[in-house]
């Protein structure tokens, strides 16, 4: 079954009671049983809910996985993965990852004895150097947020398997429309569903997908025990959003390319970060493991002036200055003071998140209007 067909049909069926083609919103906390232990598959909505269940099957299918689990946020999904570890276990992570991921690793889990290493994963030698018998997870973002670095998923899988570690890939930026990490050797795929999967800036949600039954059992145990689940209304909204994911991603990619190439021509801009450029250091890896280059772009200004960057993000009219990404509307952000503010200045600058870095989430509007907006802001 092709991607667009799966996005619309996987995991969902007409309601047996009414024939409703859309999955009903089962807005209930509990379920009546015919007798003790004699239920219809559902007992309590923290453990499982029919609307959420349909979404979990849908997301698993579009990621070419067997098991899906949805959570109250992307960070709750990350929380579930790290709770699979024990004190003394080690995690090797991308060094320019999302600030919220860095924060939960460093300020929540580090004090429980879990060791985190942050490295440039474009350099596989450095990753291999850090692996040891205590390495339990290799955590990958690709493309990375916000530097758009590309990590070779298949290469990371080989390294992880050598030491018996799990490879977890944050696939938020690419979505399964552009890449399916499980097919490249990943053990777990993570999403901030809030972004492209939901696609309409109206839901906070996270998801995990795996094809390993043992991992899935642990994932569901933690999901139920910790209780950071998503609700039926949000599940319904995401089921609806995913039905157009393939259509939206086509437009995000088209617009992203047009805007990246426009930014390259601006006299005010120093560097443009977008994996579709042949000059991108890992362009060939992106070409190999992705089916397109996405709608996320970052750029820096000549002179690296903070005030100038803040002025530009205020001058735009169509691009909205806001956190988040992946919605149908275009957003602009300043990572150093927004998404990556929780990362110490010296650490973020070492990974490229300098004061003038601006990140764009290119939406599905007409590209010409978006370019015109950027032109006037950069003038």
What is each model feature region?
Residues 106, 115, 136, 248, ...:
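PLP-dependent enzyme catalytic core of the Aspartate aminotransferase-like
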Residues 257-326, 343-349:
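Conserved small-domain helix->loop->beta segment predominantly found in fold-type I
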Residues 9, 67-268, 273, 284:
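Conserved PLP-enzyme active-site core in the AAT-like
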């Amino acid at each position: 079954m092709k991607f667009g067909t799966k996005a619309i049909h996987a995991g969902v069926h007409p309601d047996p009671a009414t024939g409703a083609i859309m999955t009903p919103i089962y807005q209930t906390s509990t379920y009546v049983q015919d007798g003790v232990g004699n239920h219809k598959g559902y007992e309590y909505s923290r453990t499982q809910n029919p609307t959420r269940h349909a979404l979990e099957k849908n997301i698993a299918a579009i990621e070419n996985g067997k098991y899906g689990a949805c959570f109250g946020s992307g960070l709750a999904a990350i929380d579930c993965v790290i709770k699979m570890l024990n004190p003394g276990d080690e995690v090797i992570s991308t060094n320019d990852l999302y600030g919220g991921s860095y924060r939960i690793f460093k300020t929540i889990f580090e004090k429980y004895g879990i060791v985190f290493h942050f490295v440039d994963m474009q350099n596989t030698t450095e990753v291999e150097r850090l692996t040891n018998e205590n390495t339990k997870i290799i955590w990958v973002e690709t493309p990375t947020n916000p530097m758009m670095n590309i990590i070779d998923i298949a290469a990371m899988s080989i390294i992880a398997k050598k030491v018996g570690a799990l490879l977890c890939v944050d696939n938020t930026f690419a979505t399964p429309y552009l890449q399916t990490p499980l097919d490249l050797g990943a053990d777990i795929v993570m999403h901030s569903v809030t972004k492209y999967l939901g696609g309409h800036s109206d839901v906070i949600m996270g998801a995990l997908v795996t094809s390993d039954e043992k991992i899935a059992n642990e994932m569901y145990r933690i999901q139920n025990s910790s209780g950071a689940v998503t609700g039926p209304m949000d599940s319904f909204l995401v089921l609806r959003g995913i039905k157009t994911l393939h259509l939206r991603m086509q437009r995000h990619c088209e617009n992203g390319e047009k805007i990246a190439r426009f930014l390259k021509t601006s006299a005010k801009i120093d560097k443009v970060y977008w994996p579709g450029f042949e000059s991108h250091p890992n362009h060939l890896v992106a070409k190999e493991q992705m089916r397109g280059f996405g709608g996320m772009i970052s750029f820096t200004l000549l002179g690296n002036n903070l005030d100038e960057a803040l002025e530009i993000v205020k001058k735009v009219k169509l691009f909205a200055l806001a956190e988040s990404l992946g919605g149908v509307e275009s957003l602009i952000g300043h990572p150093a003071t927004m998404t990556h503010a929780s990362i110490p200045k010296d650490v973020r600058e070492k990974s490229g998140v300098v004061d003038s870095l601006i990140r764009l989430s290119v939406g599905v509007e007409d590209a010409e209007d978006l370019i015109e907006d950027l032109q006037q802001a950069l003038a």
